[in-house]
């Protein structure tokens, strides 16, 4: 049976922490697996299955949602397809089900490319590239977006990895988000406000146990140190997995579903809690609010980087 996510690009490298391995998918240029010294650091899923709850996929030219799939450009109303019909939103961009093509490969890296062609609601053309590379201290991901059309194009970018630390129950991990604001949403998960997290249950800067959280929430004002904002999960024994984003990743979505199909070893998936830490350059509904939205001029290129590293093992 052919994999539901197309070609599976298997990466391997020797690192100071031991052998590292990753699997990247042709469809959505997704991160299907990543491990160091045999310890899984992202939730994986069978090759014959679609990504559960968007696991690992690239979100472009917007992450999260656009209310009603509608946005207005200089007085012209644009209508996108409603890819989240239950909530009447356009969700997670235009390439989540698209195949990418290979443009570069080494044993420890792969570069994939896909084009966003002009279409209903998005009359622009973007060339997109993503490179996954196993490096000494983790996994580094580089996105390059280029406007190859004739008009300024609105763009934003995000990714959807679910992090873990081996067989440690997700509920026992401590989630830390380096974010200073929380984004309030309506019943359709679109922003209605943004408030400081100080003194609220959404202040995760000091960390909270994942099992005590029920989140599908956006956060802003990501605090960067040396050009990177860092969010983490920490196990009771002190081991941590850290997701970092460059200065473009000023927002993050945290999602803690309790009905994720957890895969353990070669066994059948079992339902359990997972945690996605989704770095984003813009929050939900950015095409309407303008928050974090980037307009690329014809011929302009934009590079965004993020990655995963580990500590304590």
For each of these PLM feature ranges, what is it?
Residues 72-76, 102-110, 133-138, 167-168, ...:
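A short, structured loop/turn motif at beta-sheet edges
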Residues 1-3, 81-136:
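Extended, loop-rich substrate-binding clefts of extracytoplasmic carbohydrate-active enzymes
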Residues 89-103, 174, 213-289:
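Acidic/His-leaning functional-site neighborhoods
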Residues 162-248:
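Active-site/ligand-binding surface loops and adjacent short beta/alpha elements
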Residues 1-16:
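Short, Gly/Pro- and small/polar-rich lid/capping loops
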Residues 21-77, 82-84:
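Acidic-aromatic substrate-binding/catalytic surfaces of carbohydrate-active enzymes
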Residues 13, 21-22, 116-167:
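Acidic, contiguous internal or C-terminal segments within carbohydrate-active enzymes
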Residues 71-79, 143, 295-312:
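Short Pro-Gly-centered flexible turn/kink motifs
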């Amino acid at each position: 049976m052919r994999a539901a996510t197309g070609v599976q690009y298997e990466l391997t490298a020797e690192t100071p922490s031991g052998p590292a391995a990753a699997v990247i998918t042709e469809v959505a240029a997704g991160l299907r697996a990543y491990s160091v010294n045999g310890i899984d650091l992202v939730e994986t899923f069978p090759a014959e299955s679609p990504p559960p709850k968007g696991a690992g996929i690239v979100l472009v030219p917007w992450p999260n949602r656009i209310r009603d799939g509608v946005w207005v450009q200089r007085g012209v109303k644009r209508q996108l397809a409603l890819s989240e019909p239950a909530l009447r939103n356009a969700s997670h961009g235009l390439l989540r089900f698209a195949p990418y093509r290979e443009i570069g490969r080494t044993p420890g890296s792969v570069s994939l490319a896909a084009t966003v062609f002009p279409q209903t609601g998005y009359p622009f053309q973007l060339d997109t590239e993503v490179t996954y590379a196993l490096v000494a201290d983790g996994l580094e991901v580089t996105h390059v977006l280029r406007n190859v059309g004739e008009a300024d194009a609105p763009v934003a970018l995000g990714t959807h990895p679910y992090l873990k630390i081996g067989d440690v129950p997700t509920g026992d991990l401590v989630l830390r988000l380096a974010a200073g604001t929380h984004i309030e949403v309506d019943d359709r998960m679109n922003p209605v406000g943004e408030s400081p997290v100080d003194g609220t249950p959404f202040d995760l800067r000091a960390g909270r146990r994942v099992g005590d959280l029920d989140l599908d929430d956006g956060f802003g004002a990501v605090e960067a140190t040396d050009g990177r904002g860092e969010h983490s999960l920490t196990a009771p024994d002190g081991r941590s997995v850290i997701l970092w984003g460059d200065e473009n990743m000023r927002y993050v979505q945290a999602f803690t579903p309790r009905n994720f199909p957890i895969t353990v070893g070669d066994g059948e998936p079992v339902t359990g809690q997972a945690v996605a830490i989704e770095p984003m350059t813009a929050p939900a509904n950015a095409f309407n609010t303008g928050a974090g939205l980037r307009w690329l001029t014809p011929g302009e290129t934009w590079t965004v980087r993020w990655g995963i590293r580990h500590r304590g093992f």
